[in-house]
Design a protein with these regions (language model features):
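Alpha-helical interface subdomain recognition
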Residues: 2-168
């Protein structure tokens, strides 16, 4: 990353890879956030630095857990559900740190923003991972019931047809 310090942050953000690199699907990479923070003059701010380190740690732990799950030799437990929860949290934290670094530029349109709009795009996208593929609450229920062996939520829903359930 040291060879990119003189580049404009917008150039780096546009080329930032998306996906299983720890950026959380549509997140922003730590390298791109670092460059943006330097460009905006907030890299020396201890609050920004601590938030960026926490995001980096979350990304690394998620990456290690994915590697551990892949090496599980066909064993299936709650790894996929936990990875989904971790990814949702990673995208939420990417949004928070991106907006912390971007500051008031977060209100600007893509072409006017120092981030080139990637932080704004991530902000708009960030609720999606906690919804698609089963909400975070559903994932937690699956982990609790199937992995930890906890009892299911009590209620009439188990044997009752949907049409017969009480309406709000």
């Amino acid at each position: 990353k040291a060879g990119r310090l003189e580049n404009r942050s917008g150039d780096l953000v546009d080329r930032a890879p998306r996906g299983p690199d720890g950026s959380g699907g549509r997140g922003i990479t730590i390298g791109a956030l670092t460059d943006l923070a330097k460009h905006r003059g907030v890299l020396g701010d201890p609050v920004v630095r601590q938030a960026m380190i926490r995001l980096h740690i979350l990304g690394e732990v998620n990456r290690w857990n994915m590697l551990r799950a892949k090496a599980g030799a066909g064993r299936t437990g709650g790894e996929g559900n936990m990875a989904k929860l971790a990814m949702s949290e990673l995208v939420r934290q990417s949004r928070e740190v991106g907006n912390l670094v971007n500051g008031a530029d977060g209100m600007l349109d893509r072409s006017d923003s120092s981030s080139g709009g990637i932080v704004q795009e991530m902000t708009l996208f960030s609720p999606a991972p906690s919804i698609y593929g089963g909400t975070d609450q559903v994932q937690r229920n699956i982990i609790g019931e199937r992995v930890l062996g906890l009892a299911k939520e009590p209620g009439p829903a188990k044997g009752t047809p949907f049409q017969d359930l009480p309406q709000n």
